[in-house]
A protein has these predicted regions:
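Extended, loop-rich substrate-binding clefts of extracytoplasmic carbohydrate-active enzymes
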Residues: 194-277
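Solvent-exposed beta-strand/loop surfaces of large extracellular or lumenal domains
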Residues: 54-80, 258-264, 305-324, 344-350
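Hydrophobic h-region of N-terminal signal peptides that target proteins for export
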Residues: 10-19
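Solvent-exposed N-terminal domain segments of exported/luminal and surface proteins
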Residues: 95, 100-227
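Beta-strand-rich recognition/accessory modules
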Residues: 69-86, 341-417
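Positively charged n-region of N-terminal signal peptides that target proteins for export
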Residues: 1-5
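Acidic (Asp/Glu-rich), glycine- and aromatic
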Residues: 269-275, 280-313
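Alpha-mannosidase-like glycoside hydrolase catalytic domains involved in N-glycan trimming
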Residues: 21-126, 131-133, 137-142, 149
Length: 417
């Protein structure tokens, strides 16, 4: 599945002829399932960097697109857009015009991302102003309390997430009542007036658990935090208008921790969290600097107190339950939250699905040569929009359909016009 997906991502070749200033490409997006799909992401890796792009549908209507510089070299090498809907067994066709010059076109933002330092001169939790794009810390340095909302946060109008900047690297979640972008206003911490006005809030306590799909080590039969790294970098590398991408680099990680390792045994692990407009799931891509087949890892979901469990025994796991989203000492102004959590790991990478314990629904994963893609998702019972999910059965039905969607992505084909 991973190989098939990567082929679809890298299908756009020879994007710019050396003698031309512009080039047109035909892109077909084909749904091979017998059900309709919505918010279908299309991500194309460009062979040559470009300055601007224009995407038109089959009716000649311009649709929003996004150019990204994901490797930080100052050049746009990735193009993405989102197809609103594709019928069962149907295809949609687009014309992509790429130009060496110009700037990316402006569109109404459908996603948002932020990362910031805590400004101790500002007491309000939703008016912080020390925005940054990236931060690197050395081994043994923990910036968790220096960063507002403890790491980068990102959202679309359905869901919001944040990644903790410490050895846990947990994905935590923010549930919404309505479909709207909110983090610029609430900064993950809505005040009482914002709550009264219908803004969302943190809906999950994660502690040292996996939260929603954190990837960690596995050694000596136990989950291990990403404790021993030469350096750790978290960056917001794409901010919209259609997708956000958060990049996490654990450089020189000792995968044998708490045992020691040689310098040669250390490995770099780079993780990308990608959230597209119109979707409640997040795509997680993990890359290693060398063959990692011998390394075992762990991931999973927090065991929400009293939750019901779902598993297909082949990499898909979920739970639905209700608990306080914060510790007891911080519970004033909060209510118990009901959430559904889901994770989908390629079955080929699952070494074992462990029984639930008091903290987690865990997996041991591995058999990864250089890369692995998995997906995480959630729903909040607070959702009042039509796509809202409000029961364990409805959420588990969604998980089964979601797995088909992510494991059988639309086929993307490209040709020179």
């Amino acid at each position: 599945m991973m190989k098939k997906t990567l082929l679809s991502l890298f299908c756009l070749v020879a994007a710019m002829a050396t003698e031309a200033q512009t080039a047109d490409m035909k892109v077909a997006v084909s749904n091979q399932l017998s059900v309709s799909r919505t918010a279908v992401p299309v991500a194309l890796q460009l062979e040559s960097p470009v300055g601007s792009a224009l995407v038109m549908d089959a009716q000649g209507v311009e649709i929003p697109c996004q150019l990204d510089d994901l490797d930080g070299d100052g050049k746009y090498e990735s193009l993405s857009f989102v197809v609103k809907e594709i019928g069962p067994k149907k295809s949609c066709h687009f014309t992509v015009t790429l130009s060496e010059s110009g700037q990316p076109r402006k569109y109404e933002p459908q996603v948002y991302a932020e990362m910031m330092l805590t400004n101790k001169k500002i007491k309000s939790s939703n008016k912080q102003n020390l925005y940054i794009s990236s931060l690197t810390v050395d081994n043994g340095t923990n910036p968790y309390w220096m960063l507002h909302h403890h790491g980068p946060a990102f959202e679309n109008d359905m869901v919001a997430d944040r990644i903790y900047f410490d050895e846990r690297q947990t994905a935590d979640i923010y549930g919404k009542y309505r479909r709207a972008l909110e983090l610029r206003d609430t900064q993950f911490y809505p005040d009482s007036e914002q709550k009264a006005a219908g803004y969302g809030d943190d809906v999950l306590w994660v502690g040292k658990t996996f939260g929603v799909g954190a990837l960690r080590g596995w050694h000596n039969g136990e989950m291990q935090m990403l404790q021993d790294v030469e350096s750790r970098t978290l960056s917001v590398v794409a901010r919209g208008p259609l997708r956000t991408v958060v990049k996490v680099v654990d450089k020189g990680w000792n995968a044998r921790y708490p045992d020691t390792c040689t310098a040669e045994e250390r490995i770099d692990m780079t993780t990308y969290y990608t959230l597209y407009a119109g979707r409640r799931d997040c795509q997680v891509d993990v890359f290693f600097s060398r063959d990692a087949s011998e390394i075992e890892l762990s991931t999973g979901l927090v065991n929400v107190k009293g939750s019901k469990e779902y598993s297909d025994g082949k990499g898909l796991r979920g739970c639905w339950g209700t608990d306080w989203p914060v510790s007891e000492k911080d519970s004033v102004g909060h209510k118990r939250e009901t959430v559904g959590l889901g994770i989908c790991v390629p079955s080929s990478n699952v070494i074992s699905e462990l029984p639930a314990d008091n903290s987690n629904y865990p997996f041991v994963v591995g058999k990864i040569a250089k890369a692995m893609r998995y997906h995480i998702t959630f729903a909040s019972d607070n959702e009042t929009f039509p796509e809202g999910i409000h029961s364990a059965k409805a959420f588990f039905d969604y998980l089964a359909a979601w797995k088909r969607d992510v494991e059988q992505p639309c086929v993307i084909s490209c040709s020179r016009r």
